[in-house]
Amino acid sequence: MAAPRWIGPLLLLLLHFVAAVAGKSYYDVLQVPKGASEDQIKRSYRKLALKYHPDKNPNNEEANKRFAEINNAYEILTDQEKRKIYDRYGEEGLKQFQAQGGRGGGGGMNIQDIFSSFFGGGGGGMEEEEEQIIKGDDVIVELDASLEDLYMGGSLKVWREKNVIKPAPGKRRCNCRNEVYHRQIGPGMYQQMTEQVCDQCANVKYVREGDFLTVDIEKGMQDGQEVSFFEEGEPKIDGEPGDLKFRIRTAPHERFRREGNDLHTTVTISLLQALVGFEKTIKHLDNHMVEIGTKGITKPKEVRKFKGEGMPLYQSNKKGDLYVTFEVLFPKTLTDDQKSKLKSILT
């Protein structure tokens, strides 16, 4: 069977990301902690791969890049030898290992192998199967992101404390097995019942642990969008932990106000500038200068639009607009001579 048409371009992207992923660690890319188990890595990979798969994001270059990053990170972190080298020596150590002919330096798992193990068909179809798994509660945290990070992209270090399940002395009753029995509810009538009877499982307890998480802020993210860390939520005995979700909220800014993909700001000019025109620039969020001057008259509260100077659209090369409201600063007093000159000019 022929390979899907997106495989070729994607392999080129994978080569680009083989050593490093835009400064992010492979654990950050897969949104898992450094000590994540292989099962946790696989589950996180599966969810992210489904989200950013090219079939679901046609003609979306940013999503294709993310998909390539995810596959490369998965290939490294599920190879025990590569993962040990990466954990100990970082990306440079991994480069040297592969350059010296280490296992997987040129071969190893390719993208079709990865998808065969998850979705079947050598990386083709995207038949999403939801697993029925008992999970703990998700934890949702409101995270204030600066306009600068939302404009240029950035990351935040966040301290996170959570409950972790640890072994404890003794045994406990659990849900690992049930016993079926029949109860008589009337003459010749019986009802099948189940009862939890296991008291052989080791006891557990909750312990609070903390660690720093790196939350990646992507350009153009909107209020309410979430950055998820799989299985970093509340734990579940005999199940899997829920997810930790950071819900993005735009932090107030001293100069700009965001409305969707547009930016708004207010600039004060003098009465003279309002009447005769002026030259003026303002500094944008990434420090580039925007020329907002005019040769004409500017009315109080006048709003001018500067196309393409707003916020970047999420996973797009386009940008919104910048709206500048002009406040005119009037003099508090005028001398009789000034009044006379103004009358002669304006009448």
Swiss-Prot record:
Name the PROSITE patterns for this protein: DNAJ_1, DNAJ_2
Q: Does the keyword Endoplasmic reticulum apply?
A: yes
| Pfam families found in the cross-reference section | DnaJ, DnaJ_C
CDD domains cross-referenced by the UniProt entry: DnaJ, DnaJ_C
Record's InterPro entries?
DnaJ-B11-like, DnaJ_C, DnaJ_domain, DnaJ_domain_CS, HSP40/DnaJ_pept-bd, J_dom_sf
Its annotated compartments are:
Endoplasmic reticulum
Instruction: Give residue ranges for domain J.
Output: 25-90
UniProt xrefs under SUPFAM superfamilies? Chaperone J-domain, HSP40/DnaJ peptide-binding domain
Task: Check the UniProt entry and state the signal peptide residues, or none.
Answer: 1-23
Give an example GO molecular function. Answer: protein-folding chaperone binding
One cellular-component annotation, GO: cytoplasm
What is one process in the GO biological process aspect for this record? protein refolding
Q: Which UniProt keywords apply?
A: Chaperone, Endoplasmic reticulum, Signal
Q: What induces it?
A: By dithiothreitol- and tunicamycin-induced endoplasmic reticulum (ER) stress response.
Q: Which domain of life is it from?
A: Eukaryota
Describe its partners and assembly state: Interacts with BIP1.
Query: What is known about what this protein does?
Result: May play a role in protein folding in the endoplasmic reticulum.
Protein name (record): DnaJ protein ERDJ3B
UniProt source species = Oryza sativa subsp. japonica (Rice)
